[in-house]
């Protein structure tokens, strides 16, 4: 049953033009950019990326 659900979901995601890439653990890998925006964490992520870039200099 699990395999059928997995393949059905992959088909639905493909039909809707959504990402259907699979992560290491076997689950679908989401589009993190849109999820970050929807959750309201864009400013936090931007700040951390800027801080990380400063460390690389």
UniProtKB/Swiss-Prot annotation:
One Pfam family cited in the UniProt record for this chain: Enolase_C
GO cellular component: cell surface; cytoplasm; extracellular region
EC number: 4.2.1.11
The name this protein goes by in its record: Enolase
Keywords: Cytoplasm, Glycolysis, Lyase, Magnesium, Metal-binding, Secreted
Function: Catalyzes the reversible conversion of 2-phosphoglycerate (2-PG) into phosphoenolpyruvate (PEP). It is essential for the degradation of carbohydrates via glycolysis.
GO molecular function: metal ion binding; phosphopyruvate hydratase activity
Family as reported in the entry's similarity comment: Belongs to the enolase family.
Pathway info: Carbohydrate degradation; glycolysis; pyruvate from D-glyceraldehyde 3-phosphate: step 4/5
Reaction(s) this enzyme catalyzes, per UniProt: (2R)-2-phosphoglycerate = phosphoenolpyruvate + H2O
InterPro entries associated with the record: Enolase-like_C_sf (IPR036849), Enolase_C (IPR020810)
Record-annotated active site: 25 (proton donor)
Highest taxon of the lineage: Bacteria
Transmembrane annotation, as ranges: none
Cofactor-binding details, from the entry: Binds a second Mg(2+) ion via substrate during catalysis.
Compartments reported by the entry: Cytoplasm; Secreted; Cell surface
Named cofactor requirement(s): Mg(2+)
GO biological process: glycolytic process
